[in-house]
Amino acid sequence: MNSLSTIAFSLGLLLVTATAFPTPGPLGEDFKDDTTSDRLLLTSPDKTEALIKYILGKISAMRKEMCEKYDKCENSKEALAENNLNLPKMAEKDGCFQSGFNQETCLMRITTGLLEYQIYLDYLQNEYEGDKGSIEAVQISIKALAQILRQKVKNPDEVTTPDPTTNASLMNNLQSQNDDWMRNTKIILILRSLENFLQFSLRAVRIK
C-alpha cells in the first residue's frame, strides 16, 4: 500500500468512526465536531483487534526502516533505556494485565494513553525521515481507535485528555538535544513504546 492510499484508508477510517458514534463529551480538539448516527460494527472485538493489528503492522514497518537505514536495532536497547521521555506505559493498577483484569479501568487507561501518545506522534511527524504517510496513517488510526474504545467505557466523560501546557513541555523536551543520534534514538524509543502499549491493548480487548 503506497503512502497516498495508506493515508486515504486512514482518513476514511477516521471519518467512519467519527460519524458512527454519538460523542457524549469532548475527546480532545479532533473530536469536537463528531455527528450522531447509528453505531457501526466497527466496535465489535474482532474489528477493534483488526485496527490494532493494522497499526502494529505500520509501526513494525517503520521500526524495520529505522533499523536498516540508521542501524537502530536491538543494539540500541541500553541507550534507549537511559532516555526518560515519560512515555505512557501500562502498570498493574491499570487493570489491563490478565491477573487482576478490570475491563472498565483498562479501557479508560488505554483510551487515555492513546490520547497521550498524540504529542509523541506529532514529534515523529516532524522528525521522522522515512515514509511520512506511515506516520500520518498511524496517528489518524490511533485517534480512530481512541474514539472506538471511548464508546466502550461506561463513563466516557471521565476519559481525561492531555493538558496543553503539559504537551507543550513534552514537545520542548523532545526537541531538546535533537542531534541526529538523539533524534533517531527518540524515534525508535517512541515506536517501540507505542508498539508495547498496543500489544497490551490487543491482549486486553481479547479478554472476555
Swiss-Prot record:
Cell location: Secreted
List all annotated glycosylation positions.
Answer: 167
Which SMART domains does the record match to this protein? Answer: IL6
Keyword Manganese among UniProt keywords = no
Which cysteines bridge via disulfide bonds?
67-73, 96-106
**One MF term in the entry's GO annotations:** growth factor activity
Instruction: Give a GO cellular-component term.
Output: extracellular space
Pfam families from the entry?
Answer: IL6 (PF00489)
Q: What is an annotated GO biological process for this record, any one?
A: positive regulation of multicellular organismal process
Identify the InterPro entries for this entry.
4_helix_cytokine-like_core (IPR009079), IL-6-like (IPR003574), IL-6/GCSF/MGF (IPR030474), IL6/GCSF/MGF_CS (IPR030473)
Keywords, in A-Z order: Acute phase, Cytokine, Disulfide bond, Glycoprotein, Growth factor, Phosphoprotein, Secreted, Signal
Q: Where is the signal peptide?
A: 1-20
Phosphoserine sites (modified residues): 76
Q: Which domain of life is it from?
A: Eukaryota
Q: Which family does it belong to?
A: Belongs to the IL-6 superfamily.
Its biological function?
Cytokine with a wide variety of biological functions in immunity, tissue regeneration, and metabolism. Binds to IL6R, then the complex associates to the signaling subunit IL6ST/gp130 to trigger the intracellular IL6-signaling pathway. The interaction with the membrane-bound IL6R and IL6ST stimulates 'classic signaling', whereas the binding of IL6 and soluble IL6R to IL6ST stimulates 'trans-signaling'. Alternatively, 'cluster signaling' occurs when membrane-bound IL6:IL6R complexes on transmitter cells activate IL6ST receptors on neighboring receiver cells.
Quaternary structure, per UniProt, is: Component of a hexamer of two molecules each of IL6, IL6R and IL6ST; first binds to IL6R to associate with the signaling subunit IL6ST. Interacts with IL6R (via the N-terminal ectodomain); this interaction may be affected by IL6R-binding with SORL1, hence decreasing IL6 cis signaling. Interacts with SORL1 (via the N-terminal ectodomain); this interaction leads to IL6 internalization and lysosomal degradation. May form a trimeric complex with the soluble SORL1 ectodomain and soluble IL6R receptor; this interaction might stabilize circulating IL6, hence promoting IL6 trans signaling.
> Know the name of this protein?
Interleukin-6
What does the organism's lineage look like at the top?
Eukaryota, Metazoa, Chordata, Craniata, Vertebrata
